Amino acid sequence: MACYIYQLPSWVLDDLCRNIDTLSEWDWMQFASYVITDLTQLRKIKSMERVQGVSITRELLWWWSMRQATVQQLVDLLCHLELYRAAQIVLSWKPAPDSLSPLSAFPEAVKPGPVATSGRNLKDDQKKGQPVKPCSFLSSGTTMAGAQQQASCQRPCEEDAPCSLKTDVPDSLQSKYCSTSIPKQEKLLNLPGDRLFWSEADIVQATEDFDQSHRISEGTFADIYRGQRNGVAFAFKRLREVTGSSPGSMDRFLQAEMQLCLRCCHPNILPLLGFCTGRQFHSLIYPYMANGSLQDRLWAQGDSDMLSWPQRASICSGLLLAVEHLHSLDIIHSNVKSANVLLDQHLNPKLAHPVAHPCPTNKKTKYTVMKTHLFQASAAYLPENFIRVGQLTKQVDIFSCGIVLAEVLTGIPAMDKDRSPVYLKDLLLSEIPSNTSSVHSRKTSMGKVVVKEICQKHLERKAGLLPEACAETWATAVSVCLRRREASLEEARVSMAGVEEQLRGQLSLPWSRVSEDTGSSSNTPEETDDVDNSSLSVPSSVMVVSCARVSSPPPSMGNGTAQPSTSGRQEADSSSEACAGPQPPQEATETSWKIEINEAKRRLMENILLYKEEKLDSVELFGP
């Protein structure tokens, strides 16, 4: 069986795509024309180069790999086009370099004759559905068999712990994927948590032999039970073997999570209170969270009350602080979702259940290949490039935080099979444009439009009134986390801290002050094409009278006329001055009125100019 392109490790594909992306447009089109014969499809992929953060070569290879293209076909094509640097990236992944001709011999191998004929007929062979013959510089049989064997070695099982947390790893793999400074052998009981050891009998007694009435939740890798010991409530995480997992995977998973929990001490990360490594089962012990998970409270499951906006903002701020702390230790949680944000009796958030992926120490460990079907429950919180490519970086956690923030802001579940689209991320990403120009003003205006769209269409209404400024800042934090490029966790954290502070301050302000600070947009003057000239000719006396009515009414005289007192006149004068504002100088009276261009019209004019400069297509100008 041939080794297919989609079986290549992510680090190989990434290096290959970056190399081919740097080719000239002519060379790239020549390469792509051998892969895709349909010009319409080719132009569609080529147009994606305008989208920020998208590699058109990766999209091209993804399209080709879905049609069962092999690594042999890819190498043959690269050598036929004399793209030897790109071919070397693929060939360097092969386990048997002696079965390959040296790279310096490529120019001598590619001569007129069978090799050139094979390259010229590559396009015709693809049309006929025939496999492409290997070039003369590759040995038949051993090359693809070796590639297949290496592919199986380089695809780590999803249950395996990262290199820095593994216990029994072969020296060859350890030297290839891990830094030499990381210990290769580590005993489980050498951890600093020896004193936290629980016996099987203690856990069985606390959970009443894992009675079903004590079960809190059921997961892919573990079940959570509630137990009690010495009058204190605990949560017991009982690990279980997954079908098809490698031997000892549960031990490695236990050790990985223990090391992570013992290493991370933060008020917003769930602490580890104990562990058990018995013959019957393995278990981790955590404090019991009285208010369940954020997911339960968002949709008021059970008898729980609806979370208020200050509580929601505080929970989101705590979540961002927890993830930021993990990233400062070069640890990727990779399992951030509302179900894993637990709430204690004071509604303080505790991030739990990490998959325990430390950041890599070298380039090749930047990528972790995982099977998608094991992450179906978490797919709603994962970016598309991680699901497709398996590239695990800190951006995965930032994207997941954005989805959780959006859940709290909108009250919409991350996944709903009865909704179209099913995933909340697809609903939000349709609002966030993927194409951004280098013009700063256009990026700023586009971001404001996206924020307003999210607030107007999807804001949660059941949790009460959220000030407009807070809602827009919150939506900005969501947009920052979901950006394809330059997603910033720190920027989102600062935004949510501002929202939390503003909501706390409003609890102590009178309603009049709140209305001034969060003022509705109805009091903000807007420019329109239809100008009522009568509004410009209102006498100043009418304005003074209307403002004076705000003050307390004067006492009535016997003849029915109102005779204001001295204090009343002073109040009226001060009231009129406050309404009228500072009087402009005489010479500046005529220039106090000016015409301002409508923001939407100005943005449209800018987009039209960008369209004329071919920096913007018609779909982005007028919408799909």
Curated annotation (Swiss-Prot):
ATP binds at I216, S217, E218, G219, T220, F221, A222, D223, I224, K237, K337, S338, A339, N340. Residues 508-536, 549-593 are annotated as: Disordered. One of its GO terms (biological process) is response to interleukin-1. Residues 13-94 form the Death domain. GO terms for molecular function: ATP binding; molecular adaptor activity; protein heterodimerization activity; protein homodimerization activity; protein kinase activity; signaling adaptor activity. Keywords: ATP-binding, Nucleotide-binding. GO terms for cellular component: cytoplasm; cytosol; nucleus; plasma membrane. The keyword Nucleotide-binding applies. Belongs to the protein kinase superfamily. TKL Ser/Thr protein kinase family. Pelle subfamily. Binds to the IL-1 type I receptor following IL-1 engagement, triggering intracellular signaling cascades leading to transcriptional up-regulation and mRNA stabilization. This is Interleukin-1 receptor-associated kinase-like 2. It comes from Rattus norvegicus (Rat).
